[in-house]
Amino acid sequence: MESNDLNKESLENWNESWDLVMTFGMGHLTSKLFNILMNNSIFDMINESPKHYKEIAKIINFNEFSCYRLLRYFVPYGLFEENNEIFSITNKSKKLIKSGGIYNLCTFFSSNDYFKLYSTIPESFEQNKNLGPSSFGFDDFWDIVKTNEHFKYSFNQEMREFSNLSIPTIIKNTDFSSFNTVVDVGGSHGRIVGELVKKYENLNGIVFDLETVINSSIEKIKHPRIEYVSGSFFESVPSADCYVLKNILHDWDDEKCLEILKTISKSMKENSKIFIFDEIIDPNDYRKLSLFLDVTVFHFFNSRERSLNDWKQLCDKSDFKIDSINNVTQPQLLILSKK
């Protein structure tokens, strides 16, 4: 083998090895450094105009060289460009400014609270139970939200952005034109029905959620064709032509999901439909997001994301059958009707 070939092979091995080490062994370091950028709104700062690292250091009250080290760390990741010690953001990192759509997601996922929440994940897998809440001293995830105002605020902001990313694909790629009344089960601030009543002039929307959620939602969508109803989907839901459950059932195990579906079944009209927007894990085409969410809901709630076979088995145990599937929406859509 030629010397140049040996050198090339050696270099490739070096790069592949360190890519693995830095991605899987040191990802926590990148996340914590990234959190410094998010907490100091550095992407917004540089988005206004490229800045010398010394100017940035002065604004955020950092040591100049420490600031330079932090900024240059993310140049190979494509988040900054550097020219004569002046840093600018890239098309990629424009999504990380506060109005970019994922600012709160990135800030929460790289936060100390989130790291703390995952400190017990080895035990969750070892014991096959959700020990995420135990990292905060609780058995139930929602007790963290109820008692920790900082966590509650960050979590709600993150969830709002998570929802905002998916809603446009849902509205664009789902036909609600045949329905008079749509209930968004667990609908929180009413964003989905808010978009639906704008698109369909004859449609009425009901946002159904817990009383505490309805009363505390500061961004509640107001419209003459939108009604807010409080209650528990384990007890009763309003009567409607269509029930939307977006990222609801993945928070619950099969037994609880069957209870939710049974409750809805009691209020359904003859031709009512259930629109379930949730991940459908494809064993032949795994998606990073689906599997990230699967691990997350397991660690938080002892629940799961489901494959198509899992969804079919769930329906077999209930009053419902799957009429159709839409893989274009994010998350995917399963349309259910009574058997």
From Swiss-Prot:
GO terms for molecular function: 3,5-dichloro-THPH methyl transferase activity; O-methyltransferase activity; S-adenosylmethionine-dependent methyltransferase activity. Coiled coil: none annotated. It comes from the Eukaryota. S-adenosyl-L-methionine binds at G186, D209, S232, F233, K246. It is an enzyme of class 2 (transferase). Its EC number is 2.1.1.-. GO terms for biological process: biosynthetic process; methylation. Transmembrane segments: none annotated. It catalyses: (3,5-dichloro-2,4,6-trihydroxyphenyl)hexan-1-one + S-adenosyl-L-methionine = 1-(3,5-dichloro-2,6-dihydroxy-4-methoxyphenyl)hexan-1-one + S-adenosyl-L-homocysteine + H(+). SUPFAM superfamilies: S-adenosyl-L-methionine-dependent methyltransferases, Winged helix' DNA-binding domain. InterPro entries: COMT-like, O_MeTrfase_dom, SAM-dependent_MTases_sf, WH-like_DNA-bd_sf, WH_DNA-bd_sf. Gene3D superfamilies: Vaccinia Virus protein VP39, Winged helix-like DNA-binding domain superfamily/Winged helix DNA-binding domain. Keywords: Methyltransferase, S-adenosyl-L-methionine, Transferase. PANTHER family: O-METHYLTRANSFERASE CICE (PTHR43712:SF2), PUTATIVE (AFU_ORTHOLOGUE AFUA_4G14580)-RELATED (PTHR43712). Belongs to the class I-like SAM-binding methyltransferase superfamily. Cation-independent O-methyltransferase family. COMT subfamily. This is O-methyltransferase 7. It comes from Dictyostelium discoideum.
